[in-house]
Amino acid sequence: MTASLSIIGGYLGAGKTTLINALLRGALPGRTAVVVNDFGAVNIDADLIASADGDTISLTNGCICCQISTEMVDTLTALAARGDLEHIVCEVSGVGDPGRMARWRSFPGLTAGPLVVCVDGTSARRLLHDEYVGDVVRAQVAAAEVLLATKVDLATEAEVADAVAACLETAPSTPIHLGDAADPSTTLREIFAAEVPDIAPAPQAPGGPAAAADHAGLHSSTTVEYREPVDPERLAAHLAVLSGDLVRAKGTVLAADGIRYAVQLAGGRVEVRPHAAREAAGTTSAIVLIAAGPDAAAVAERAAAQLAALTREPARLAP
């Protein structure tokens, strides 16, 4: 069996992780392997994990999740040699250019799947025209062979129509699918069955999803690490106040009741929910804050300082 290799891109908070989790739950026919930069960001449901071996997590439904720790060539060579996969999907960094990953789809032993870019259905136009990150988002949308508008269940019909129109201004001939939170499988099967244009030869130089020309100069991140339990609702309230300054925030916190919560900020909205591993090992909590613009570093540091004061014992700040 020859697997197809597809690329998933999209700006920070556009819904890539939600898409990846749907794929790992078996949204596509046959076995799927997803290649990511960091296992921790995917938040795989503990009930789905059959085994974990180094950089590979095997799931009970036959799908696997791989973390890039060496070179892209090594990872794809190993996956192509398995012979039991129908789909391989590589995630590109939220500030990366998925177009630069497109040539990997001609890797020996694989066939080319589509280059899919996620766009936030609630904030697409704002991001496409943002003073600081608009160029990044427009490049991602322009590179897409298929666009997936996410979070449409959180948007009004007018907002969804405006998001679609904004995307078509940048990519007028690119098909756009509306995500269906209730039934993601049907939409994803249509997307990953899309026709693919001719692909240039795969690069031989080392690299991986993280090497895809990200716009690091525009973005700055700071991590807040708590050493004692955190009130997730209080943290969420402070993130809501900071939503105009940050383009993304994501992490997990351990509450006083011993339950671990996933907390994230995307598109100006804050979400708090129990983590897939509700009673995850360890007592630390951490949240990554990302700002964009010429003063991104200072903005991220100020936001981190505010959040660090939420516990009696000062939190640790890390780049």
Describe the residue ranges of each PLM region:
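Short glycine/proline-enriched loop/turn "hinge" motifs that connect secondary-structure elements
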Residues: 109, 139, 277-281
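Alpha-helical scaffold elements adjacent to nucleotide-binding pockets in ATP/GTP-utilizing enzyme cores
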Residues: 75, 100-104, 140-143, 162-166
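Short amphipathic alpha-helical segments and helix-helix/interface helices
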Residues: 24, 91, 102, 138, ...
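Nucleotide-state-sensitive switch-loop elements of NTP-binding domains
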Residues: 2-135
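Helical mechanochemical/support elements of P-loop NTPase systems and associated helical scaffolds
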Residues: 4, 68-71, 97, 133-140, ...
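Short glycine-centered, acidic/aromatic-flanked micro-motifs in structured strand/loop junctions
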Residues: 10, 22, 150-151, 291
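Conserved beta-strand/loop subsegment of P-loop NTPase cores
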Residues: 33-34, 89, 111-120, 139-152, ...
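C-terminal accessory "lid"/substrate-recognition subdomains
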Residues: 146, 152-286, 291-319
